[in-house]
Every structure is written in C-alpha cells, then in structure tokens.
Amino acid sequence: MNVYLTDGTPACFYTAVFSACTDKGCIVTPARDFQIPLGAALIEVVTDTEKSARVQKKLRAIDGGAIREISLILRRGCAEREMTALEYIRLLVERKAPVRDMLSHPAVLEARDAIKKVTGEAHNFTGFLRFMEGENGVFYAPFSPDNDILELILPHFL
C-alpha cells in the first residue's frame, strides 16, 4: 500500500492523482500527523505542473463540470477530502462519462455530500456575515468557517 503525502494544494493533489488513480488501495492525504498503516510506503508528492495539467485536461474531456466539483470537494475541512475526490475521479475515469447523477454509488454520494456542505456553508455566510468598522475606518468581519469558503463568498461582498 502506498500513502501519497501532498502539500494540500490542488496542483499537488492532481499530481498525486496522476499516479494514485491506478494505484488501488492507496491513500492520498495532506496530513502530516496521519497514522501510517503497517507496511505502507510513504511517497512525498512534489507538484508537477505537467502531470497536474494532464489530469485536469482528461477530466475536462470526460466531464466539463468535474473540475469545479472537485475544487469544491477539496475545499472541505475534513481529512478525507482528498480520498473523496480521488474516488470520484476514479469513477469518472472508469465510466468515461459524467457520473454526478449516479446517486446510488457511494463515491458520488460522498462527493455530493461534501459539495453540499461547502456550498451550503458559503450560502449561509453570505446571508449571516456582519461587518464592523475598525478604528481606522476599515470594515472587517471576523468569522471561522468549517470549510475553505473565503474565495467563494468574497464576490458577494465586493
């Protein structure tokens, strides 16, 4: 079994997918405090823009909306986000067609759940986030989301 350690960026994740997609039973994680299974080989993934671009090009050819969905999955605040995205990508590559409507498949269900949690939290914060004026006249809104949603809600406030 191989464990692919990424740096947490989407480009590094897609670089890991280049090898991990065909490596059944592997684990992709950015966690440095990950409990390594007995006998597992650790592979430190270094971002390779060529491999990352090839994976993204293949995904766009299969399903144009898959890149956005995977981007939302990778914004999830849980440790399993890379594995959820990897299983979704494996299913896309296996079927060679969009799979978002295969709601009985566990990988699709898990991916849709992750997407729903990220987009739902972003929607909630656009409605409930309140700004305060600082001493120097700058407005700010302290908040602590469960997921990485700042880039998703920013256009709403500009």
Predicted feature residues:
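Generic N-terminal helix/loop capping motif
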Residues: 21-24, 58, 62
